[in-house]
């Protein structure tokens, strides 16, 4: 089965802030921290392991299996426009999995259009299932499985599935904009 690997990093921002640091090897044994625990330790909703391992500034859960994501989005309550959306969260504090980036999964029902919205956050959309189109400003973009496209900041956008269902993962700089008190969101009718 084909695998797609997509790294979304906050490195451009961190680089502009001159705050990029890394520990170069060789390291025979990496120090254990909470993210070295097995992912199964973080699967039970509302329950966390007590551990003497040190914390990390990101989600200690390094893998969110797609089968679990699909089950969760199927059970998610629909929004007013019929779509469903879930946030990927850090199981320790309920915050984002990366402190500066927001990650969601969005499920669209066939032939239904999401409400138009615009935000000061910049967003990357990765189509995981289905096909459809997005109206982004004055431009219509058709998409299908494995397509990647962006939503520029402060541009009206909506999505429509043309298949029975479509699922996207979205990643944005919403978290850093929120922390800088610069996040603004408008939702159309």
Language-model features: locations:
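Glycine-rich loops and low-complexity Gly/Arg-rich segments
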Residues: 29-34, 111-113, 128-133, 151-152, ...
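A short, N-terminal "cap"/entry segment at the start of jelly-roll beta-barrel domains
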Residues: 21-100, 104, 184-187
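A short beta-strand-loop-beta hairpin characteristic of the jelly-roll/cupin
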Residues: 1, 117-145, 182
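A short hydrophobic beta-strand segment most commonly corresponding to one strand
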Residues: 1-23, 125, 164-184
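Short, flexible loop/turn elements at secondary-structure junctions
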Residues: 9-12, 107-112, 128, 155
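Conserved metal-binding segment of the jelly-roll/cupin
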Residues: 1, 5-10, 136, 142-163, ...
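A short beta-loop-beta micro-motif enriched in histidine and acidic residues
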Residues: 93-102, 109-124
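Active-site lining segments that contact anionic ligands and/or coordinate catalytic metals
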Residues: 83, 100-103, 121-124, 129-131, ...
């Amino acid at each position: 089965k084909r695998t797609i690997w997509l790294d979304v990093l906050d490195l451009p921002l961190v680089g502009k802030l001159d705050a990029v640091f890394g520990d170069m090897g060789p390291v025979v044994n990496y120090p254990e921290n909470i993210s070295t625990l097995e992912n199964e330790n973080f699967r039970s909703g509302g329950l966390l392991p007590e551990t003497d391992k040190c914390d990390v500034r990101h989600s200690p859960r390094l893998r969110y299996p797609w089968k679990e994501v699909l089950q969760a989005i199927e059970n998610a309550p629909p929004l007013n426009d019929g779509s469903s959306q879930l946030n990927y969260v850090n199981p320790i504090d309920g915050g984002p999995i990366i402190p500066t980036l927001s990650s969601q999964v969005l499920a669209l029902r066939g032939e239904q259009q999401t409400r138009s919205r615009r935000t000061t956050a910049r967003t990357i959309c990765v189509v995981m299932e289905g096909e459809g189109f997005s109206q982004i400003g004055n431009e219509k973009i058709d998409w299908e499985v494995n397509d990647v496209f962006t939503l520029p900041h402060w541009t009206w956008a909506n999505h429509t599935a043309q298949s029975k269902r479509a699922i996207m993962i979205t990643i944005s700089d919403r978290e850093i904009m929120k922390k800088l008190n610069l996040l603004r969101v408008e939702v159309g009718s």
